[in-house]
A protein has these predicted regions:
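Short, small-residue-biased leader/transition segments that mark boundaries at the very start
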Residues: 1-2
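Phosphate-binding P-loop
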Residues: 14-21
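The conserved Walker
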Residues: 30
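Conserved substrate/cofactor phosphate-moiety recognition/catalytic segment
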Residues: 39-87
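ATP-dependent NMP and nucleoside kinases share a basic, alpha-helical "lid"
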Residues: 63-70, 74, 84-144, 151
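Small-molecule kinase domains that catalyze NTP-dependent phosphoryl transfer to phosphate-bearing small molecules
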Residues: 126-129, 134-181
Length: 187
């Protein structure tokens, strides 16, 4: 199969929106603040007239990825699907914000490889696991401690922190501080 090109291309779509389509890939442990940051970033971008969309891992598991579990293979497929959807949205000229644990470097690198240079910003939300356990917004750490969640990232499954991300956010810093850092590299 060959990719079919159309007259209205990525450059024209981006120009119409007065922005460069790209993906902001937020990665970090469960409870690190990815979804909170994604929500605040989209709100800020919207207020500034930017066209954006959040692809939240939890929401995607209610539909597109509902058939996937949390084995390393399923996590790889989750990242692959989300990166392909994000690529289509970047092609439409959108700023796509993903909020996914995406624990394995190989999967994140594979995701990055499908984008053009400068279109993929890997952002590590660096929050100590102890803080994530205290936050535990979905009760997952409690379930993991009770033995109800095998393959739980950061506890019974490794999280491979990015070695050289485009940006590291301190998950214990203020939301405003983290959004300011993101806006600086996006707009």
């Amino acid at each position: 199969m060959l990719f079919r090109s159309y007259e209205v291309d990525k450059a024209k779509r981006s120009a119409q929106k007065h922005q460069k389509g790209r993906v902001v890939w937020l990665t970090g442990l469960s409870g690190s603040g990815k979804s909170t940051i994604a929500n605040a970033l989209e709100t800020t971008l919207f207020a500034n007239g930017a066209h954006s969309y959040v692809l939240d891992g939890d929401n995607l598991r209610l539909g597109l990825n509902m058939d996937l579990g949390f084995t390393p293979e399923d996590r790889a497929e989750n990242v692959r699907r989300v990166s392909e959807v994000a690529k289509l949205m970047v092609d439409a000229g959108l700023i796509v914000i993903t909020a996914l644990v995406s624990p394995f470097a190989a999967d994140r690198n594979r995701a990055k490889s499908i984008f053009e240079e400068g279109e993929f910003l890997e952002v590590f939300v660096n929050t100590p696991v102890e803080i994530c356990q205290q936050r535990d917004p979905k009760g997952l750490y409690k379930k993991s401690a009770a033995g109800e969640l095998p393959n739980f990232t950061g506890i019974s499954q490794d999280y491979e922190a990015p070695v050289s991300p485009d940006l590291v956010l301190d998950g214990t810093a203020s939301l405003e501080e983290n959004i300011a850092k993101l806006i600086k590299i996006i707009l």
